[in-house]
Amino acid sequence: MGIFNGIIEFLSNINFEVIAQLTMIAMIGIAGPMIIFLLAVRRGNL
């Protein structure tokens, strides 16, 4: 049972809100260059 308590304690200490916010910022940050790349590849025709 000791290892399970350790895992539960580890998961309860993780701040999932910060992880979600950083994930969203990364997705938004990647979306900009992706749009520019698509515009360049398709010669401006989205």
UniProtKB/Swiss-Prot annotation:
Predominant subcellular localization, coarse grouping: membrane
Transmembrane segment boundaries: 21-38
Keywords: Formylation, Membrane, Photosynthesis, Photosystem II, Thylakoid, Transmembrane, Transmembrane helix
Ranges per topology, Lumenal: 1-20
Residue intervals on the Cytoplasmic side: 39-46
InterPro entries: PSII_Ycf12_core-subunit
Entry annotated with the keyword Protein biosynthesis: no
GO biological process, one term: photosynthesis
Entry GO terms, CC: photosystem II; plasma membrane-derived thylakoid membrane
Subcellular location: Cellular thylakoid membrane
PTM annotation (N-formylmethionine): residues: 1
Family of the protein in this entry: Belongs to the Psb30/Ycf12 family.
HAMAP family xrefs: PSII_Psb30_Ycf12
Function: A core subunit of photosystem II (PSII). PSII is a light-driven water plastoquinone oxidoreductase, using light energy to abstract electrons from H(2)O, generating a proton gradient subsequently used for ATP formation. Helps stabilize PSII.
Protein name per the record: Photosystem II reaction center protein Psb30
Gene coding for it: psb30
